[in-house]
Amino acid sequence: MAKVQYMGTGRRKKSVARVRLVPGEGRVIVNNREIETYFGLETLRVVVNQPLVLTETKDKYDVLVNVHGGGLSGQAGAIRHGISRALLKADENLRPELKKAGFLTRDPRMVERKKCGLKKARRSPQFSKR
């Protein structure tokens, strides 16, 4: 018999995470590495685990993630988004608390492009009066 698994796709900035929830004991594996080795910062690990802690499903599922693009912060946000969507497929009754925490909303903020004549997106060259 096929194993039950729930899929979810999360995005943040330039990162895209494909998340699979499989019934298990709470391990999180990102790109075939344990979460502790992939994310060095504790804050990023906390961000990834937020939906599981909020819904009290940390010990019910193993989380298998493929993530690419962007930096570590964007990837952590994308994984959080993907886990939240996968949890919804597992149990629709979790929607109100996930929605209230803001985990189901795709963060629309993207990097603003650099404009010509300026040093960065908004930073102008230093002004000299004389």
UniProtKB/Swiss-Prot annotation:
Signal sequence, renumbered to the chain: none
Keyword annotations: Ribonucleoprotein, Ribosomal protein
A Pfam family recorded for this sequence: Ribosomal_S9
InterPro entries tied to this protein: Ribosomal_Su5_D2-typ_SF (IPR020568), Ribosomal_uS9 (IPR000754), Ribosomal_uS9_bac/plastid (IPR023035), Ribosomal_uS9_CS (IPR020574), Ribsml_uS5_D2-typ_fold_subgr (IPR014721)
Cellular component, GO annotation: cytosolic small ribosomal subunit
GO molecular function, one term: RNA binding
Swiss-Prot/TrEMBL GO biological process terms: translation
Entry keyword annotation includes Kinase: no
TM stretches of this protein: none
Statement: the UniProt record of this protein carries the keyword Ribonucleoprotein: yes
Superkingdom of source: Bacteria
UniProt-listed HAMAP family: Ribosomal_uS9_B
Family: Belongs to the universal ribosomal protein uS9 family.
PANTHER family assigned: RIBOSOMAL PROTEIN S9, SMALL RIBOSOMAL SUBUNIT PROTEIN US9M
The name this protein goes by in its record: Small ribosomal subunit protein uS9
Organism: Clostridium perfringens (strain 13 / Type A)
